[in-house]
């Protein structure tokens, strides 16, 4: 009786915690790249990922030809190993790079793990594509490459950590909720080159660091630096969706978006990040550079690019 009772309790827990998927739920995928069992429940053991498994049967985002795990075995660490990280950001520690030694794999993984939906939403290819897109956009923001650079221009991401090596404007706008601190500058720092007090303030609040009073932390603490980039990536700023929602297929364009030519794909992320400068006026070298990084990283992760890579014909979002 006791064994039977425990079995019933265990089944009840599964029933409460499981999320239906597959044919039993209209083809829905499990969250966090879990396997969908033949019975329509999500999990990561052989009961879910073995015989009859309906989707994401590799048991995580690290299926297929993905390089070996670094040992973390979940999330972004199951997609990109330390050695692959070094290959993708091949020259980030070059003597010519101002950020030499700053951007580490451990800081990248630690910051990513603070945002558990990053690289764990959707199927294995979607997870890989998100990693490629994030590293591509941030590589463009921090690039030290040029057309004839050794190993090509797209091997030089993460070369810088501060806009113009710190010789930049203050970037302070009057915002009562995010007041600028005396003597502080809010120029571009970190992988996403976070800029302006109205971004430093909420980013710091979200990650638990007072970046209004200590913006230099983004250029001195690598984990904090990466966290600001993931904050920007994961956070919608209306009317813009989050970059995460776009690359994982969770964003549906509104009527205004459709009228503006904004469509799902990597190009929409460029519009979110810097559309006012780069989008809506035809071919643009900066957009092409972002695409070049993205294609290289997708190729290294063994995943397709998806559609709509540029924003040449997308109208930028209105200023916030």
From Swiss-Prot:
Keywords: Carbohydrate metabolism, Chitin degradation, Chitin-binding, Disulfide bond, Glycosidase, Hydrolase, Plant defense, Polysaccharide degradation, Signal. Pfam families: Chitin_bind_1, Glyco_hydro_19. It is an enzyme of class 3 (hydrolase). This is Chitinase 3. Hydrolyzes chitin and plays a role in defense against fungal pathogens containing chitin. Inhibits the growth of T.reesei fungus on plate assay. It comes from the Eukaryota. Belongs to the glycosyl hydrolase 19 family. Chitinase class I subfamily. The gene is Cht3.
